Amino acid sequence: MTQTLSQLENSGAFIERHIGPDAAQQQEMLNAVGAQSLNALTGQIVPKDIQLATPPQVGAPATEYAALAELKAIASRNKRFTSYIGMGYTAVQLPPVILRNMLENPGWYTAYTPYQPEVSQGRLEALLNFQQVTLDLTGLDMASASLLDEATAAAEAMAMAKRVSKLKNANRFFVASDVHPQTLDVVRTRAETFGFEVIVDDAQKVLDHQDVFGVLLQQVGTTGEIHDYTALISELKSRKIVVSVAADIMALVLLTAPGKQGADIVFGSAQRFGVPMGYGGPHAAFFAAKDEYKRSMPGRIIGVSKDAAGNTALRMAMQTREQHIRREKANSNICTSQVLLANIASLYAVYHGPVGLKRIANRIHRLTDILAAGLQQKGLKLRHAHYFDTLCVEVADKAGVLARAEAAEINLRSDILNAVGITLDETTTRENVMQLFSVLLGDNHGLDIDTLDKDVAHDSRSIQAAMLRDDEILTHPVFNRYHSETEMMRYMHSLERKDLALNQAMIPLGSCTMKLNAAAEMIPITWPEFAELHPFCPPEQAEGYQQMIAQLADWLVKLTGYDAVCMQPNSGAQGEYAGLLAIRHYHESRNEGHRDICLIPASAHGTNPASAHMAGMQVVVVACDKNGNIDLTDLRAKAEQAGDNLSCIMVTYPSTHGVYEETIREVCEVVHQFGGQVYLDGANMNAQVGITSPGFIGADVSHLNLHKTFCIPHGGGGPGMGPIGVKAHLAPFVPGHSVVQIEGMLTRQGAVSAAPFGSASILPISWMYIRMMGAEGLKKASQVAILNANYIASRLQDAFPVLYTGRDGRVAHECILDIRPLKEETGISELDIAKRLIDYGFHAPTMSFPVAGTLMVEPTESESKVELDRFIDAMLAIRAEIDQVKAGVWPLEDNPLVNAPHIQSELVAEWAHPYSREVAVFPAGVADKYWPTVKRLDDVYGDRNLFCSCVPISEYQ
């Protein structure tokens, strides 16, 4: 045997698991595109002056088992104290049926945002359920699904309040002094760029302040007090002030709906509906508003529509509000939200139903009453008489209480003057309450739970009578039917079957990087060492998290060529916002705050101009030339015109046109010459890793889509993570946090998300990916992504012209297929092709972005040659079908393309089409059939007849 022990150990085994084509397939594809090797292909495509001489030093690869063991050892450094800190985060009991069938199920977590509703009806239904939960609990008319976290939702509520306010000259936003501190932090950050003045005061003093356009109240204050704001809201409404209320989703089960009290906007975190704390996230926020404000709402809204056969079908409604269409005029820059977490919360509500939720909420409140009664019986004073689950307990010996708590492995809230905060949750037991008595009173307290229970059961006044909910919630059958595990399992499976995810087929969406989310990468996110930590626990309890985050940040620094990485942003769009704020604050530190012009190429993703607008910048569009590259002449002219007001350029690399622009360094130099900064959008980082880097190219800041390049799954529309990498001069200006000091970050800036490290519990996914791939594997992944894209382009270019290419006719990691000539000749559109691909078992490529009338295809490195060939064969077969239409064999108004997708029920219905049933549903090469459950959606009907709550179950059948 000639192999060495090192070869037999095969530490790089995962590289071959992650990359789809094996060595033989890679060589076949290289031959097809006319390249001798991966290195030769890369050398032809990537400009020589930006190619790295040596790959970033992120270590050797590790096997799945070795990496899991290494990460488990790191995770074990976290200390799992029982946390009663509260502040918007509590421990939960995620029902195992949801854990196994959703959170751990690639049929749910590998799906994409439901832009293609025909292959997304399952998660759209779950999201509609989420909206129904929100509507029932808030008492409002319109809900979205969903936002990034509660603090971000507060900032969105402020922005929305200004949009809808009739007080156009008012510029002040009032925040009640007992909102959560992290919420206030994010609101202040957003207000600064919008030029709003934030006033923080006792809610009852709001009327003392003039020129207020909006008010933020918190129904259950951060230290636990329940407020009856009915009269105050009425007075504010009489003065035309827009009222937003932050609410606790579990408290709303028992408390009066803020919408019934007159609130215009209600929002909060859905975390305690089954989603672990995860050291801060990911968690979905709910958001609701009055019907009259629906077109000013941020985020996705799921609406009920009809398909081509008149059947009920769901879709994302009113998309003209959103960044991918309205760009800088959008209501928000939100793209990725928190769909997977919203769906967990919605299914938590389905599983427990109204009776179960009331039992949980009442049990939490009863235990809180028992704790309060015992403490008061022993002479301790509560700061608030009215509470749901949180007590603010005044203590004489605070240091002693905290010391006893630490000894008992308990976290209390400690930042309240002369008091401690205690928040109970659904995991709290009577034994926990007895332990809390010992911490606060000493071991010889003599209290008995059952005796206290009898007392409070007959005389609880901790919720005001006027604040008790008097209406029914969750009356729709979906919340009253699936309470056995068998029924719940089958319901979830019925939803999953309606959707197309990566566990069934390639999702070739350009600019989305739908690559493998390996099982080994996903396993650690449910480890209790990661899942159960409170984001505001003492840092010494989170040493495992700190080590993992620091190591991941170090790897990302090396891979990007930057000097520092900030992990706080919760999505790519939020990363853009954070990076632009860093640029803004950098200019201000140099007394150049007047620099507010952001140059953006015409091809940019819609989040770019939307984020620039949010950061207080003016957007100036830079033209692209006929080859899709940034027009340098126009860039110089626009930069010179901006002059001393130039803030930055936002550029994507490789470009959204799917090519490595030869002049990217010159672009950076022009902007720097005029005093601007270069923001390089990290959306296409999958074509850079190991080959080049933003820092090496000359950029100053980038966000990284960890849910693209670094394998966090898309979850059907979230979660995501968008950390930013920065050069040293921008490092002091990345987001900070008002509650937690971020180690190693010397920043004085406000936060952009509620938790200091964003959605920290999904960072292990990216850690595992980098650890298992190593430097060698990461570079190879980028190279194979490029190879796969060029293979598709070369095989399809005769049937569907590739719109933009670089040197030697090559593309980067994605290609744009131009459908416009075919449409002119035949009337068949890119939409028809996209829908016909469903019949062939594929999700559509990205439609009409960045160029109308095109399809953008990104195969990623994870797809094998077999799957690529299946996609290519499907596209060629569709081209042959188009030729049949062109030849007059099938009429334009009745052919397999314009009628696509076809559903099962059509097979047994009367058939009057000029093509066979077999052509319709089993076109050439289709063996493993995916069946959509609805035909093509009627978008116009959906927006003209907006309906965004649950419909009768019979409508889905």
From Swiss-Prot:
Catalysis: reaction(s): N(6)-[(R)-lipoyl]-L-lysyl-[glycine-cleavage complex H protein] + glycine + H(+) = N(6)-[(R)-S(8)-aminomethyldihydrolipoyl]-L-lysyl-[glycine-cleavage complex H protein] + CO2
Organism superkingdom: Bacteria
EC number: 1.4.4.2
Key words of the record: Oxidoreductase, Pyridoxal phosphate
An example Gene Ontology molecular-function term: glycine dehydrogenase (decarboxylating) activity
A Pfam match: GcvP2_C
Cofactors required: pyridoxal 5'-phosphate
Annotated GO CC locations: cytosol; glycine cleavage complex
Gene Ontology biological process: glycine decarboxylation via glycine cleavage system
Alphabetical list of InterPro entries matching this protein: GcvP, GDC-P_C, GDC-P_N, GDC_P, PyrdxlP-dep_Trfase, PyrdxlP-dep_Trfase_major, PyrdxlP-dep_Trfase_small
Disulphide connectivity of cysteines: none
Residue numbers of N6-(pyridoxal phosphate)lysine PTMs: 708
Family: Belongs to the GcvP family.
Oligomer status and interactors: The glycine cleavage system is composed of four proteins: P, T, L and H.
Reported function: The glycine cleavage system catalyzes the degradation of glycine. The P protein binds the alpha-amino group of glycine through its pyridoxal phosphate cofactor; CO(2) is released and the remaining methylamine moiety is then transferred to the lipoamide cofactor of the H protein.
Protein name, as recorded: Glycine dehydrogenase (decarboxylating)
Native species: Escherichia coli O127:H6 (strain E2348/69 / EPEC)
Gene: gcvP
